[in-house]
C-alpha cells in the first residue's frame, strides 16, 4: 500500500506541516521523508531549537522549511484572515495570541495555501488538533460533522496486504443515524484512495433483526439510508461482526447479499465499540493501525497518538499527504 502511495506522491510532491518541530520523532520522520524526495516537511518552531534538536539526534533535515510563529513575516495577514474566519468570535488580539501556538499557526498555513496538509498530536491532545481544524479549515460543503477512520493492515498469505477500514473509532461519541451515514460516505470515499474496494457492514449485537432495541434500530435505519445514498456500493447490515467477516457464519444466518461474510469496511455504532474494536484487531489480530484519519474537512488534517514512534509519524505523513 505505501509503495503505491509514495509512487503517486513522487509524481506530485506535497508539503506537510508538522506542528511539533523539535520533537525527535518528527525530526526522524522528516529526515526519512526528505531522503525519499516525495514530501516536503514544514516544521513549526524556533529554527535554532529545531536545528539543535536535529543535530543532537543525528538527523539531516536540510531541505525542510522551518517557520517560527514568533518571527513570521506574514503574521498580520494571517491574523486578518483568522479574524474573518472566526466571524466575530475572536478579536484580532485573541487571534494573534492563538497563532503563537503551533497548532493554530500550522492550521492557518494550510488554510492560506502555504502547505497542503498537516500532521500534529505528537505532544498535543486530539482536541487540540481537531479544534483549530474545525474553526479554521471547517467541514466540506454538505458535511455536518468531522469523523475518523483507521486503516488496518496486515500481511496476508497471498503475499498482498489485507486492508480493512474501521469508523468512527475516535471522534463521535454516539453518532445518530444521519451522522453514521455521513461517516459511511466519507469512509468509503477515502478507503478507495488506499486501494480498498469497500464492502460496508453496519455493525451491531444483532444480525438482520435477531436482536431488538433502539441501538439495533439505529444501525438498521442508518444502513438503509446509506444504501439509498450510495446504491453502487455494497452495504449490508445490521450485522454482528462474525456474520460480517465469516462466510460460514453468514451462510448459517442466511445472509445472501455481497457483504455478509466478506466485509472489509466496518461502521461501528459508537465510539466505545469502534475504539475497542480497532484495538482488539491491532493487539490480538496483528493488524497495524494507522489513524485516526480525520474525515469531512476541507483539507487533510490528521492527529497522531502521543505514544507514536517515528515510523508511525512517517506512515501517517504519507497517508495524510495522499489525501491532499
Residue ranges and their predicted role:
Residues 1-260, 265-324:
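Anion-binding alpha/beta catalytic cores of soluble intermediary-metabolism enzymes, centered on
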Amino acid at each position: 500500500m505505501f509503495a503505491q502511495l509514495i509512487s503517486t506522491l513522487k509524481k506530485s510532491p506535497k508539503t506537510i506541516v508538522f506542528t511539533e518541530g523539535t520533537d525527535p520523532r518528527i525530526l526522524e520522520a522528516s529526515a526519512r521523508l526528505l531522503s525519499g524526495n516525495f514530501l516536503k516537511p514544514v516544521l513549526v518552531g524556533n529554527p535554532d531549537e529545531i536545528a539543535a534538536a536535529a543535530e543532537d539526534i543525528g538527523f539531516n533535515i536540510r531541505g525542510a522549511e522551518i517557520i517560527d510563529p514568533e518571527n513570521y513575516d506574514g503574521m498580520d495577514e494571517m491574523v486578518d484572515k483568522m479574524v474573518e474566519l472566526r466571524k466575530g468570535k475572536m478579536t484580532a488580539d485573541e487571534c494573534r495570541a492563538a497563532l503563537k501556538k503551533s497548532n493554530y499557526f500550522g492550521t492557518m498555513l494550510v488554510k492560506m495555501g502555504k502547505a497542503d496538509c498537516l500532521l500534529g498530536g505528537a505532544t498535543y491532545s486530539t482536541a487540540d488538533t481537531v479544534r483549530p481544524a474545525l474553526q479554521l479549515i471547517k467541514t466540506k460543503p454538505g458535511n455536518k460533522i468531522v469523523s475518523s477512520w483507521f486503516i488496518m493492515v496486515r500481511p496476508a498469505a497471498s503475499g498482498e496486504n489485507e486492508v480493512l477500514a474501521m469508523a468512527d473509532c475516535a471522534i463521535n461519541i454516539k453518532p445518530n443515524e444521519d451522522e453514521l451515514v455521513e461517516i459511511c460516505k466519507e469512509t468509503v470515499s477515502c478507503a478507495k484512495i488506499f486501494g480498498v474496494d469497500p464492502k460496508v457492514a453496519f455493525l451491531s449485537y444483532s444480525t438482520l433483526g435477531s436482536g431488538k432495541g433502539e441501538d439495533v434500530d439505529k444501525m438498521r435505519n442508518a444502513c438503509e439510508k446509506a444504501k439509498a445514498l450510495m446504491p453502487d456500493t455494497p452495504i449490508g447490515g445490521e450485522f454482528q461482526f462474525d456474520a460480517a467477516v465469516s462466510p460460514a457464519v453468514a451462510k448459517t444466518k442466511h445472509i445472501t447479499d455481497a457483504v455478509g461474510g466478506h466485509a472489509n469496511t466496518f461502521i461501528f455504532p459508537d465510539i466505545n465499540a469502534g475504539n475497542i474494536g480497532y484495538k482488539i484487531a491491532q493487539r490480538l489480530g496483528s493488524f497495524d493501525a494507522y489513524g485516526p484519519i480525520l474525515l469531512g474537512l476541507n483539507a487533510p488534517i490528521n492527529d497522531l497518538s502521543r505514544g507514536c514512534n517515528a515510523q508511525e509519524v512517517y506512515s501517517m505523513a504519507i497517508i495524510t499527504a495522499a489525501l491532499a
